[in-house]
Amino acid sequence: NEADDPKKIFSITQRAINFIEKNNKKSKPFFLQISHYAIHSDILARGTSYKKFNSKKTGKIHDNLGLAAMTFDLDESIGLILDKLEELNLENTYLIYSSDNGSVPIITPRKYYEESYNYPLSRGKWDATEGGIRVPFIVMGPRVNKTRYSETPISFSDLLPTIIDIAGN
């Protein structure tokens, strides 16, 4: 039902879980990339998620109920994947979470850049400036220090050789 999953977050996640279960039975390493449509326009979320944020006090920049609800849905779906990995005891698994770009700098009705989702970062999505390229990059796995934080810039073009090294090839 599209009303229960307007961005296909949970149907994409269920397909990923099915893939994990199927490949776990093969007892061989596997690679899975999940590319959600969220967080992206159109801003859509489940009705229950909208209700969860409806009574929250908004801030000057963080005032978009739909964006909060959609982010909540995506976060919940990632939790389902983590739960499945734990259930199947897939301890030798690396999870990489990131985004392709920063936010659109100006979304109507915002008139000024200072009111944008990226502020105080410079510009956004289609720019090679901090607001366009500074995105979350989270890695979880057996040889990853859970308390480590780094401000070192990375490039996705360097990611494939790293994944190959992790896989032992």
Residue ranges and their predicted role:
Residues 23-32, 88-91, 113-114, 128-132:
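Extracellular/periplasmic catalytic domains that process cell-envelope and extracellular macromolecules
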Residues 35-36, 72-110, 138:
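Metal-dependent active-site segment of extracytoplasmic phospho-/sulfohydrolases and closely related
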Residues 16-66, 104-105, 110-112:
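Active-site His/acidic residue clusters
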Residues 34-38, 46-47, 98-101, 133, ...:
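Active-site-proximal beta-strand/loop segments in catalytic clefts of secreted hydrolases
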